[in-house]
Amino acid sequence: MTNFFNRSPKHQSHHYQPHQQDVTDISYSMENVSISSNAMMDIDTSYRSSKPTYNNPQQQQQQQQQQQAQNNLFNKENITPLNSPTKSILHNSPQQAKSSTSPQHLYNKLVNANYNGNSPQPGIQQQQNNRALQNNINQLQPPLNKRYKLTEAEFYAKANSARTKRLTSIAQLYFLDYYCDMFDYVINRRERTAIVEKNLLTDPMYKNDITKQQFEWKNYIGRERALLRKRRLKPKHKDFEMITQIGQGGYGQVFLSRKRDTREICALKILNKKLLIKLDETRHVLTERDILTNTRSDWLVKLLYAFQDQEKVFLAMEFVPGGDFRTLLNNTGYLIPPHARFYISEMFAAVNSLHELGFTHRDLKPENFLIDSKGHIKLTDFGLAAGTVCNDRIESMKIKLQNLQNLNDFNDDSNNDNHHYQVPSSLIYERQKIFKQSQQQQQQQNSNNTTANSIVGSPDYMALEVLEGKNYNYTIDYWSLGCMLFEALCGYPPFSGSKQDETYYNLKHWKTALRRPQTKDGRYVFSDRTWNLIIKLIASPNNRLQNFKQVQQQSYFSDIKDWGNLRQKTPPFTPQLDNEEDAGYFDDFEDDEMMMKYKDVFARQEQNEQLLEKSNTTTTTTTTTTTKNGKRFSPGSKFNDNFIGFTFKHKSNPNNKFTNGSGNTGRYGNGNGNNNNNGEINLLNMVENGNGIGNGNSRSSRLNPLATLY
C-alpha cells in the first residue's frame, strides 16, 4: 500500500525542507495566463525584441548585473502557494527595474498599455478593445478583498490552522479508505469469479450445456454490474422511510427510519444546515460525525450514514431501542447497590472509550446513556440535535453562577429569614421530596410559558471548573459520573435545590453542600466504599481520580474481575421488544400530554426559525446560479463548504455484499430468501416490503421490570 503514495522519482531528487519542497513544486506548476487577441494587440511587447546594442563592454556588464538582480527578485516574488488568493502572473509582463513602491498590478499595466497618453477620449474601436480587456481582467483578478499575495507567515498560519488540518486528515482518510476498499472489492470479485467459473465447469447441471453456462455467466455479470453501481451511489434523504419520531431538539428532529434498499433500521437525525451555521454549531456537528466514524467500540453508538443536501444534514445512526438511563431512573426512583454498580461500571467503560479517541464530553447526563436491546449501556449525544454543550449555554450558565454572588449578602441579613440560605439537609427523604417538587415546578413552568426559556440549564452534573471558565481536562466527565452514581442510589442529584438558583449556589459551594445521605434513624445510605468513590469523583481537579486505571482500582469495583467482559454479564433489565421497529421505550410525539415536557424545546426551535427567517430577509439571496470570479456557483454551495468531508457510509453496508439471483451468497451458499443470516441482499430481485416485519406503532407505556424490585 505504501508504494501507491510515494513521491515520484523527479521529486525525490530534491532535498528541500518539507514545506519548502511543497511551495517550490506549487510555484513551478503555475500555468501561464492567456489573454485574448484583442487585448494582446494593445500590450507593449517591445521588450521581446532583439538584444540591445551596447556602446562599450563596461555598459554591457553593468546592464547584465542589473538584469541578473532583477531575475533573482522575480524568482522570489513569484513563488506563491497554490491556495494563495492570487497566482503570480508577472512573468507574462515586462521586467522592470526594482522600484521603492509596491509592484504594479497586472490590471493597471494592461490598462496603461491601452492608452498612449495622447488621446484622453479613446474612439469606438479603442472602447471595444477596453471592454474586451476588462472582461479578461475580470476573469484574471481575484475578489477585491483578496488582491494581495499571502506572506510566508500568513501562508503557514493558514496551513497550520485547525480547519486546514481537519481537511487534510479527511483527504488522507478518504484516499486510504478509497484504495483499501477498492482493493478489497477487486480481490473479492476475483474470488467470486473463480468460484463461478469452477462451478460452471464442474457442476453436472452446466458442465455439458453451453447455453446454460452462457445464461448463468450473463446473470453473474449482471449482478456484478448491479453491485458496482450500488457502490457508487451516495445516500439521500429519499432513501429512508420514516417510521416514527423518537427525538426532538432545538436544531432538528430524530426519526426511527428504515433504509429502503438495505432494510436497515436506524435513528435518523435531520438538522437545519442554515440554522447550524447561523448559531455557530457547525463544529459540534462535525465533532459528532468525527467521533462516530472513528469509533469501533461497542460502548459508543455507531454511525451508519452521514450525508447532506442544500438545506439539511443527516446522520443515520444505530438505533438503540431500550430508551435512556433517565427513563429507567424515572420508573424506579432509585437503584439497589448491585444494579447501580452494574450501570456505573458500564458508563465508565463507555466514557473511557470516548476519552481514548481524544474527546471530552463535558456535559454527561443520564439522558446521554442509552440501553440497547440486550440491556447494556451505549453512550450517545456528543453535542448535536439538542444543542448539548454549546458554548453559548456554558457561557450563560457561567454568567448565572456569577450573578448568584449576591446571595452571599443574604447570609448577613439575620432579620430576613426568607433570604437566609441553609445548607442542604442530609436526610434522604427530605431531599427526595424537594427534588420531586422542583421537577414538578419546572414542568409547570414549561407548560405555562409560551416562549422559549433562557438557554441557561440546570448544572446538576456539570463540573464547576467548566462553568467558571477555568482550564479543565477529561476528568470533568468523572465528576458527572459521580453525580449520576449519587442520584442512582438516592433518587436525587447531590446539588439539587428547591429552585434553580439554589442548585447553582449549592454547586458554587460544593464542598459544603456535598453531604453523605442519612435515613431518619441516622444510618448512612452509602457504604463506606461507595462514599469513598463519590468523594474522589466529585472533588477538586487535583484530588480527583485522574485516569480509568485508578477508577478500576477502587474498592467499590473490587467485585469486577474482568473489565473487558462487562458486556457478557447479565444485565438487571432487558427491554421487551415486539420487533426491530419497536419504539415503545421512547416518548410518543403524537401524545399531547407527553409533549408538554418538550414545550420549551419546541419554543426554542420556533425562536431559532424566526431568527433564521429574519436573517434571510435582511440578506438578498437568489436561487439561480450566479457568476463569481468567472465561475458559476449556486448560493447554497456556501453552506456545503462548512461540511466538507461530511459524507460517510459504513463498511458493513449490505450494498457492499454480493448475492446471486436466488438469494444465495456469491459463494453459492444455501440462502433461500432476499435476506439471509449474513445480512447480504439480493441486488436483482429485492422485495420492497420485507416479510415478518411488525408495524412498529406500538407506543404504549412500558412497565420497567426493575420497578417491581423496589
UniProtKB/Swiss-Prot annotation:
All residue ranges annotated as the Protein kinase domain in the record: 240-557
Region (Disordered): 1-20, 46-103, 613-636, 651-674
Annotated Gene Ontology cellular component terms: cell septum; cellular bud neck; cytoplasm; nucleus; spindle; spindle pole body
One GO term (biological process): regulation of exit from mitosis
Enzymatic class: transferase
Stretches assigned to the AGC-kinase C-terminal domain: 559-658
Organism superkingdom: Eukaryota
Molecular function per GO: ATP binding; protein serine kinase activity; protein serine/threonine kinase activity
PROSITE patterns named in the record: AGC_KINASE_CTER (PS51285), PROTEIN_KINASE_ATP (PS00107), PROTEIN_KINASE_DOM (PS50011), PROTEIN_KINASE_ST (PS00108)
Compositionally biased residues, Low complexity: 58-70, 617-627
Active site (UniProt): D363
Biased composition (Polar residues): 46-57, 71-103
Deletion consequences: Leads to inviable cells.
Homology family: Belongs to the protein kinase superfamily. Ser/Thr protein kinase family.
Protein name: Cell cycle protein kinase DBF2
Lineage: Eukaryota, Fungi, Dikarya, Ascomycota, Saccharomycotina
